[in-house]
Curated annotation (Swiss-Prot):
<comment type="subunit">
    <text>The complex is composed of two ATP-binding proteins (FbpC), two transmembrane proteins (FbpB) and a solute-binding protein (FbpA).</text>
</comment>
<comment type="similarity">
    <text>Belongs to the binding-protein-dependent transport system permease family. FbpB subfamily.</text>
</comment>
<dbReference type="InterPro" id="IPR000515">
    <property type="entry name" value="MetI-like"/>
</dbReference>
<feature type="transmembrane region" description="Helical">
    <location>
        <begin position="377"/>
        <end position="397"/>
    </location>
</feature>
<feature type="transmembrane region" description="Helical">
    <location>
        <begin position="144"/>
        <end position="164"/>
    </location>
</feature>
<feature type="transmembrane region" description="Helical">
    <location>
        <begin position="93"/>
        <end position="113"/>
    </location>
</feature>
<comment type="function">
    <text>Part of the ABC transporter complex FbpABC (TC 3.A.1.10.1) involved in Fe(3+) ions import. Probably responsible for the translocation of the substrate across the membrane.</text>
</comment>
<feature type="domain" description="ABC transmembrane type-1 1">
    <location>
        <begin position="140"/>
        <end position="345"/>
    </location>
</feature>
<feature type="transmembrane region" description="Helical">
    <location>
        <begin position="330"/>
        <end position="350"/>
    </location>
</feature>
<dbReference type="GO" id="GO:0006826">
    <property type="term" value="P:iron ion transport"/>
</dbReference>
<protein>
    <recommendedName>
        <fullName>Putative ferric transport system permease protein FbpB 1</fullName>
    </recommendedName>
</protein>
<keyword id="KW-0813">Transport</keyword>
<keyword id="KW-0997">Cell inner membrane</keyword>
<feature type="transmembrane region" description="Helical">
    <location>
        <begin position="469"/>
        <end position="489"/>
    </location>
</feature>
<keyword id="KW-0406">Ion transport</keyword>
<keyword id="KW-0677">Repeat</keyword>
<keyword id="KW-0812">Transmembrane</keyword>
Length: 632
């Protein structure tokens, strides 16, 4: 438990004795409840302040103490008739607040505070010293320029695919959807290394161009070019999903009205349809901008001498020269950029309405696009499909080759090397750890997401919007920043959990918590509140209402959250790469450690987990279609 030399930790349990003496004072119920609540808050503050001052690391027994304090606070608030005295709702709300504070707010504050410390010395001037270095300025400029370029190009491709599936295709729309969504379920590093197999120094496309056309620049891929190609492949599907929904919501009768007023197809598209897509286009650009800014895997594989913020933070932590101050400063800058864009998207775009029709009206038919635009879109989709087929074909074929780029002879030795050495060697330990961590994290994500959604949607209390915003903040915090903030926050007293499997699971849960929450909110929006009221009127508690009324009706939403969280937990890299050790290593870190020297082994792992991730995702889609529900 972390005993001090003078047993300070015994004092943490003394307030519990005081609670037993309070009834002897015969105070009024309201006064006694307020006194108990004050003592609880004071006890928790004393526990954490004393542990911080005396460097006492809390052990697992403190969890029992915190549960006890939470129960006492719940009883006190119930006596004060907070939330109508519903103990389950009060306890759930307290747990959620503690969860958000300790694993979102506290780590975020830790990374900002670390900016102003040089070791244990307070040095506020070092922030400006770091930010004014020419190298740091170049890294920040590179990141912003790359993110802007990828955001624009990904949005263009996403718009083209969305127009194809909604305005051009009749029987072939599924082809566009499959190849547009496939990169979403592709794990990190896969796209980057797949591009390397095709276009790198030993790539077959590079060899073909060199042999037949005298192409001599073999290093053109490593840098801005390679990162941009990989990120566009990875993030254009996100843009597609946003714009596909926006195009489907545009009412066709508007297009018919334009044609009846003698407008041609070019005028209808550029002056009617395109302006209605502006919020979706802006939303797409901002989201892709954040994703590109926070991307860690592709720049690490293809960056070369083109440094970006995410990878530079990693090198400051894991490189030969440990520099927490520079890592914290760059992490804070990355967080500020991401939060600024997230707030713009959340407030500005989220509050705008571009409704095209209200009430009941004639539906009309979708009109054809201009011929020039139509054939351009078909050409873009054809290029995208061929490139992706070559990319994933390279991954499959490369896993069976002796040595990619040198000897293309087929062999099974790569799989035998990884999976034929027993469960204690090769790739098995990392794979088993990954399955265990993801298997624990996914149900917790779905459960806490449902709990937050139920309280936010069904209950009214002060700070509800703030609670929802802080939960959604997990999406805005880049994975690299989250990993660094967890190291800074939990690598010392009072909460020392770095190097354990617990911190990996917590990171997975908190990163994916908004997925479970948004899926449950979407499902609860389809359920009438009268169902809850009927249950409560029949003397059913909130716990029973949630378990026996709401939960069975939210199976599709929970399934979507469960599967999506499991896939994301299996494929996450940027956050947990700072948190794993030799004993808690996951397969993505093992995959990274294979490196170029064993690239064929990487192909085996990539192919195996591509099959797992894609299978999970499409089974999830089929099951959701069975329930006629798909929230994304």
């Amino acid at each position: 438990m972390g005993w001090a030399s003078f047993n300070l930790t015994w004092a943490w349990f003394l307030p519990v004795i005081v609670y037993g003496a309070l009834p002897l004072l015969r105070l009024p119920q309201q006064t006694q409840a307020k006194t108990e609540l004050f003592l609880t808050a004071l006890s928790v503050l004393f526990m954490f302040i004393s542990a911080t001052v005396y460097k006492i690391s809390m052990g697992y027994s403190v969890i029992v103490l915190l549960v006890g304090y939470t129960a006492l606070a719940t009883l006190s608030l119930a006596k004060l008739k907070v939330m109508q005295g519903d103990k389950f709702i009060i306890a759930s709300l307290l747990c959620i607040i503690l969860l958000i504070f300790f694993f979102i707010v506290y780590p975020t504050l830790a990374i900002f505070v670390s900016m102003f410390y040089d070791g244990d010395t307070f040095a506020p001037q070092q922030v400006m010293r770091i930010l004014t270095q020419s190298y740091i300025v170049r890294v920040i400029t590179n990141s912003l320029f790359l993110s802007g370029f990828v955001g624009i190009v990904s949005t263009v491709f996403g718009l083209a695919f969305a127009l194809y599936t909604t305005r051009i295709a009749r029987r072939t729309a599924f082809i566009g959807k499959i190849f547009s969504i496939l990169p979403i379920v592709t794990p990190p590093f896969v796209v980057g290394l797949g591009v390397t197999l095709m276009l790198g120094r030993s790539g077959y496309v590079t060899e073909f161009l060199s042999t037949n056309f005298g192409f001599s620049s073999h290093n053109w891929l490593y840098g801005f070019n390679g990162i941009a190609i990989a990120q566009i492949l990875a993030f254009a599907p996100i843009s597609f999903m946003i714009l596909d929904g926006a195009l489907k919501s545009v009412h066709p009768s508007i297009e018919e009205a334009s044609y009846t007023l003698r407008a041609n197809r070019y005028q209808t598209f550029y002056q009617i349809i395109f302006p209605l897509l502006r919020p979706a286009l802006a939303n797409s650009f901002l989201i892709v901008f954040i994703q590109s800014l926070a991307d860690f895997s592709n720049p690490l594989v293809l960056g070369g001498s083109f440094d970006v913020i995410a990878t530079q933070i990693y090198f400051y932590i894991a490189g030969s020269q440990l520099d927490y101050a520079s890592a914290s400063t760059l992490g804070s800058m990355l967080l500020i950029f991401s939060l600024a864009i997230f707030i713009i998207q959340y407030i500005w775009i989220g509050n705008r309405s571009y409704v095209t029709v209200s009430g009941k009206s004639y539906r009309g038919d979708v009109q054809e696009l201009p011929n020039g635009l139509k054939y351009t879109i078909i050409g873009m989709l054809g290029f995208w499909v061929i490139f992706n087929m070559a990319l994933y074909g390279s991954i499959f074929y490369g896993s069976f080759t002796v040595n990619w780029g040198v000897n293309y002879t087929l062999t099974l030795k790569n799989y035998a090397m990884l999976f034929g050495q027993g469960l204690s060697d090769g790739a098995w330990p990392s794979l088993i750890n990954t399955l265990i961590y993801a298997g624990i994290a996914a149900p917790l994500t779905a459960f806490f997401g449902l709990l937050i959604a139920y309280i936010v949607v069904r209950k009214d209390f002060q700070g509800k919007k703030s609670l929802e915003f802080l939960t959604m903040l997990c999406f805005a915090v880049p994975g690299t920043v989250a990993g660094v903030s967890y190291i800074l926050a939990f690598n010392n007293a009072p909460l020392y959990i770095t190097g354990t499997g617990i911190i990996v699971i917590i990171s997975m849960v908190m990163r994916d918590l908004p997925i479970g929450m948004r899926a449950a909110i979407a499902g609860l929006g389809q359920l009438d509140k009268s169902l809850d009221e009927a249950s409560l009127s029949l003397k059913g508690s909130s716990w029973k209402t949630l378990c026996f009324i709401v939960l069975p009706l939210l199976k599709p939403a929970l399934l979507s959250a469960l599967v999506t969280s499991f896939v994301r937990a299996m494929t996450t890299v940027s956050a947990i790469i700072f948190l794993v050790t030799a004993d808690t290593r996951v397969y993505r870190i093992y995959f990274k450690s294979c490196g170029r020297r064993r690239i064929r082994h990487c192909d085996c792992i990539r192919f195996y987990f591509n099959c797992c991730d894609d299978g999970n995702y499409f089974v999830f889609r089929l099951d959701c279609r069975r329930y006629a529900y798909f929230p994304f």
